[in-house]
Amino acid sequence: AKNAKEIESPTGMALSGEVEDFLTQVTFPPKGERKETTGVQGAKQTATVAFTAQGMSKYSRTENAVIDESVAPVMIDNKTKQVVTPGADGYYAVAGQGKYKITAKGTDVDVEFIPEDNFVGTADGISIRRTDNNGYTTDWLSKDKVALPSINEVLDNMDGLYIPTVTPKELEGEDKTSTDVQGASQTGTPEFALEGTNSNGEKVKITPDFDYPAKFVSPTTGKVINDPVLTVEGEGIYYLDDLTGKVTFVPEPGFTGTAKGVTVSLTAPVGRDKNKQVQSEFIKTATAKYTPTVTPATISSTNKVSEDVQNVPQTQTPTFDLSN
């Protein structure tokens, strides 16, 4: 080009000229990681979700972008898809499932999940969002989902995703005993609980109800029976309140000593999933025994005396008392 017109409106082919290099600076937003954990019912679960910055820093031709550690990670409820603010204790609770806590660990984020005592199954989980030093967040969508699919399938973006699963515990029974005097009725309530303890070191009770009643186990067949009245020859009659598991024992008048007792069985769900449903694998069975002891009654007599003048009839009643 030798004149202004050729420079402004070039046509044809130039056989000579200058070429200038131009360095294009490309920036990319950061992305998170998908993490899953599995733990037993009531136990705390933990994980670390990694975050990766991509591309170059906006104001540098030599420095790579990094996760901005001065910007706190953000928690998002996967059910509501809304950013949430944890409570004063740092936890955010999802009703019917459990509570979450996130803590920045350099560029990554530590996650803690404490399930509710009666929650089992896969939780909705949470999403975690971070920001890089270019001001970009992980809340972005790939234009080519085949080549670069979303990391977070819940929000359909690149936020970090954490999903915990809680497996059901077994059910265990606790035997009960009682003692009373000969002829007196006695009661005892065998109890049922999840094996072990929850994250606070407490036993979690499972009680009978209308849908899952307690039942006697036949002492002869060893099988569960539907009859709430059980007679044991030579001992007495046992009555079961199937909605509470309480057993009432009415001994035979002449029975003393420790009875053979009865076994109570409970088949019930140890928890429910995030939709409040009971899955077949959540239903467990345990047995517990109730054993009454009857102490023999003794009869003690009290002599009586009377006094009056000659030829006047006198009366008095000696007394007899039962005691153990």
Where do the language-model regions lie?
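Acidic, turn/loop-rich segments in luminal/extracellular domains of secretory-pathway
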Residues: 1, 88-158, 224-286
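A broad "non-catalytic interaction surface" signal
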Residues: 1-29, 51-63
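Short amphipathic alpha-helical surface micro-motifs
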Residues: 4-8, 230-231, 299-301
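Sparse, context-dependent recognition of short Cys/His-centered cofactor- or disulfide-binding micro-motifs
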Residues: 7-9, 175, 240
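Intrinsically disordered, low-complexity boundary segments flanking structured domains
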Residues: 8-12, 86-88, 149, 201
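Solvent-exposed loop and beta-edge segments used for protein-protein assembly and interaction
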Residues: 16-18, 41-43, 105-107, 120-122, ...
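Extracellular interdomain linkers/hinges and stalk-like, low-complexity segments
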Residues: 27-66, 131-207, 265-324
